[in-house]
Amino acid sequence: RGARWQVQPDSIAAIKQTGVFQKLSLNNILGKIEGKNPSEIVIVGAHYDHLGIDPMLDGDQIYNGADDNASGVSAVLQIARAFLATGQQPERTVIFAFWDGEEKGLLGSKAFVQSFPEIKNVKGYLNFDMIGRNNNEAKPAHVVYFYTEAHPAFGDWLKNDIKKYNLNLAPDYRPWDNPVGGSDNGSFAKIGIPIIWYHTDGHPDYHQPSDHADRINWDKVVNITKASFLNMWYMANEKDF
């Protein structure tokens, strides 16, 4: 009887890993400035979740996520403050979004686009994910600027404003015909919403406890925030883009 269960050279076993399902409680945080034409909406967002704590690590066990993505969260907060400081009501409603669950697969932004009753009124989305580091110390002004290729105005805005306001940025312009990957911009691009995404590339501290605030290039964060405020101002007020 025992020989019946022996594995022979011509025996093949197929094992399929189905995974373990876990119920998560996630919370997106949204703020809004009502526009003169509230039937049209633009959104600026960044994910605020990170990796938490790993008690199995020796030494530093806390994943602080200074670049990924406190840098992006700070930009959204400052843009909201700047919109209010103008004292002007934008033409379109502006939503300021802080997404949960990005590190688990864009869960927060996916849930939003699937459940937001006015999603068809969203005309554009601007995303921040990791905007505070140098992947090459010889190029401290480097930033990758992804945008929907069918909307060349997005590229023109940044080029013009860098010259006009003397912003210390050296963008790598990457128009993308289907910008569905990388970060929360993908959730919006997949349903045809035009996007802009600021990103300063990877670095050795990515998803490591060493992603500390003292390694942030603060001048870069400030310049990206200034440029993206202008992006959002145009997105909220220009008739067409």
PLM regions: where:
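Soluble metallo-hydrolase cores and metallopeptidase-like ectodomains found primarily
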Residues: 1-65, 81-88
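Short helix-loop-beta-strand segments that form the rim/entrance of peptidase-like active sites
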Residues: 59, 82-105, 120, 128
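Second-shell loop/turn segments in exported
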Residues: 14-20, 57-69, 85, 98, ...
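Metal-dependent peptidase/peptidase-like ectodomains
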Residues: 99-200
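Active-site alpha-helical elements of protease catalytic centers
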Residues: 65-80
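Sec-exported extracytoplasmic/periplasmic mature domains
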Residues: 1-3, 78-88, 114-118, 159-167, ...
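Solvent-exposed loop/turn segments at secondary-structure junctions
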Residues: 2-6, 35-38, 48-52, 101-105, ...
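His/Asp/Glu-rich mid-to-C-terminal helical/loop segments that flank catalytic regions of hydrolases
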Residues: 85, 202-241
